[in-house]
């Protein structure tokens, strides 16, 4: 009957939850071992590369405890690293990353960055990486990398997402996006300022100006990452 089915379903869910917990614990142990190796200068990574591309993002997840009761949302930090793109597959119109490795966790930012650096050291000779290019969504925790010389770029997808979410006028969206795509950050910020002022309204329900200023503040806060490295005159091997 239905009560029996629900009971079996609950048992199955608990079993899956337990398996996932054990798997997570094992992965965490491996990550901690890599951190210890890094601090002891015994990391396994030997490969030397001219450039390492890194991407970091935060994803907010709805959480449940073992009894499937709702818990407050937590941010899962996601890190992806790769050496570049497969030239042959690019010619065929397919994008494929070379040497892609991922890491994810719910730790505090300091601990996550420690595991992230250990993940890099497990695969590469970190001291011999010529340049590190870091793409991120602008989250505050992303600005805490081990390598202060990493070049930061604001992730284009998140910029487009912010423009669409904060600017209601389609024409203004296109103008802002075009200024961003053509590498004109100063003109873009000025345009948003003018737009935000032009849509001010005495109607408290009209949030157009407020949202435009929020977009401005987001981009201004991440000003250093608005231009991709190649448009800054930075050459990498």
Predicted regions and their residues:
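Single conserved hydrophobic/aromatic residue that forms the stacking wall/gate
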Residues: 1-12
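Compositionally biased, low-structure terminal segments
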Residues: 3-4, 80, 181
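RNase H-like nuclease fold core
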Residues: 10-14, 18-133, 140, 208, ...
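Acidic/histidine-rich catalytic cores and adjacent linkers
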Residues: 24, 115-153, 157-237
């Amino acid at each position: 009957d239905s009560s029996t089915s629900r009971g079996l379903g609950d048992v199955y869910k608990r079993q899956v939850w337990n398996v996932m917990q054990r798997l997570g614990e094992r992965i965490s142990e491996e990550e901690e071992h890599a951190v210890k190796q890094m601090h002891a200068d015994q990391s396994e990574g030997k490969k030397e590369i001219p450039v390492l591309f890194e991407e970091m993002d935060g994803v907010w997840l709805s959480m449940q405890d073992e009894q499937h009761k709702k818990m407050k949302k937590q941010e899962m930090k996601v890190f992806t690293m790769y050496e570049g793109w497969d030239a042959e597959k690019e010619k065929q119109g397919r994008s494929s990353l070379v040497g892609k490795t991922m890491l994810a966790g719910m730790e505090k930012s300091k601990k996550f960055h420690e595991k992230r650096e250990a993940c890099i050291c497990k695969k590469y000779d970190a001291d011999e990486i010529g340049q590190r290019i870091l793409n991120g969504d602008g989250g505050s925790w992303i600005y805490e990398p081990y390598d202060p010389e990493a070049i930061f770029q604001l992730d284009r997808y998140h910029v487009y997402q912010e423009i669409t979410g904060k600017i209601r006028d389609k024409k203004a969206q296109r103008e802002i996006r075009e200024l961003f795509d053509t590498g004109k950050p100063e003109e873009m910020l000025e345009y948003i300022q003018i737009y935000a002022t032009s849509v001010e309204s005495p109607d408290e329900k009209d949030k157009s100006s407020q949202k435009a200023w929020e977009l401005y503040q987001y981009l201004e806060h991440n000003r250093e990452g608005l231009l991709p490295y190649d448009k800054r005159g930075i050459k990498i091997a």
